[in-house]
Amino acid sequence: MRYAVVTGVSSGIGKAICEKFLAKGLYVFGSVRKKEDAKYFEEKYPNTFHTLVFDTTDYPAVDKAVEEIHKVVGKKGLSVLVNNAGVAKYGPIQHVPIEELRQQYEVNVFASVYLTQKLLWLLGASKEAKWQGKVIQISSTAGVMTRPMLGPYSSSKHAVEAIYDALRRELMIYGVEVVLIEPGPIKTEIWGKAKSGGNPYKDTDYGEIFAQLDKAVDEIEKIGLPVEAVAGKAWEAFVAKKPKARYVVAPKKLMFKAAMYLIPDRMLDKIFYKDLKKLTQES
């Protein structure tokens, strides 16, 4: 039996990855914040799905979950950890509340790193281990290319990219692989949850722009790939003997890669500035 841990399986990318791994025969520990959010998997996979109820930022609860995992896995070890849980917020860096920025990092960065640290020994990060697992971190194309107004989310994903690059290189001494999955536009609920339902920046020079962001996000989601596309890449990374360091999952992938790695920063500045001007004209 191969064991996996997947965080944030109640919906979206996490749910799709959990479903994929279960369908392929893995025993999956899936984390949710409310037990009822795991009902779908508990009923469909009663023998191979194990519900873990915790908020990833609640470290004592995470510690208990790790103990729970260890009791089941024992000396067999984990095959893979998929860090998926995350939140998204947008707003102008000039005015975004520090607490909101901190929340992005608490969930998207620190909570992810904490769980990874606690599970690495079960993934074979030890000289005595007789197995080597994988860490799959769900990042974002926003972790490489930053759009205006997405600074809070994008900066947290930049941090994720750097930390897991470092971890990948450090864990080479154990043979434990670390992979980054970088989704672009995906039909998922994360941005729907990010919508404020108001305009906290209406009294700033960004008020008109922010007022149009929800519409802009809706337009991006229309061209988004299904969450199953990300799940497919996660599975590809898991089964690969020599997985890539990172996998981009986006419509028009070559265009995204060009924007991320080839187009000069100043040219991107002009492109994004035109987008901002367009938003003000639409308000």
Curated annotation (Swiss-Prot):
Gene3D superfamilies noted in UniProt: NAD(P)-binding Rossmann-like Domain
Enzyme Commission number(s) from the entry: 1.1.1.-
Residues at the catalytic site: Y153
Organism domain of life: Bacteria
A Pfam family assignment: adh_short
Keywords for the protein's UniProt record, in alphabetical order: Lipid biosynthesis, Lipid metabolism, NADP, Oxidoreductase
Name of the top EC class for this enzyme: oxidoreductase
Pathways per UniProt: Lipid metabolism
Gene Ontology MF annotations: oxidoreductase activity
Statement: the UniProt record of this protein carries the keyword NADP: yes
InterPro entries: NAD(P)-bd_dom_sf, Sc_DH/Rdtase_CS, SDR_fam
Catalytic activity annotation: 3-oxocapnine + NADPH + H(+) = capnine + NADP(+)
Family: Belongs to the short-chain dehydrogenases/reductases (SDR) family.
Protein purpose: Reductase involved in the biosynthesis of capnine, a sulfonolipid present in the outer membrane of gliding Bacteroidetes and essential for gliding motility. Catalyzes the reduction of 3-dehydrocapnine to capnine.
Protein name: NADPH-dependent 3-dehydrocapnine reductase
Organism: Ornithobacterium rhinotracheale
Record lineage: Bacteria, Pseudomonadati, Bacteroidota, Flavobacteriia, Flavobacteriales
Encoding gene per record: capC
